[in-house]
């Protein structure tokens, strides 16, 4: 059974903001901040849900696979499809200046930064216009080195310190966007 806040993508829905498509999400929050979560491998989903509930922010959990989400009308599950970059494309097409994107996918982060969104890695590291070019270049270099066999292994493990840094960065990002909206 599909819940009211689950959403399948369609061309018509893609042309409208999420609030226009879902009566349960419209007029439920005091701000227009939205968090988009690249959810398939995100280690901080529970932290996002807690911060969003406390600050009354809508969350779109975007994945190619089924992801369990809390029973909360401010949190929606987006089934972006099974294409290789379907979830990334869905997020990148919608992210804007009042949005926060949580992803460890560097190409997606680059697309969202260019769209004006605030982008955070799960370890709390912000991606910015100043840093994204170098971050993308390093990612591409590491991919080439791994494929040639010169480097084996992956990134270091996720730590409690990373989780704490993420919580702080997310809270600061939401409050910064809300302050900017209230002065506009």
Where are these regions (language model features)?
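N-terminal amphipathic/basic-hydrophobic helices that include classical n-h-c signal peptides
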Residues: 1-26
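Nuclease catalytic cores that cleave nucleic-acid phosphodiester bonds
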Residues: 21-184
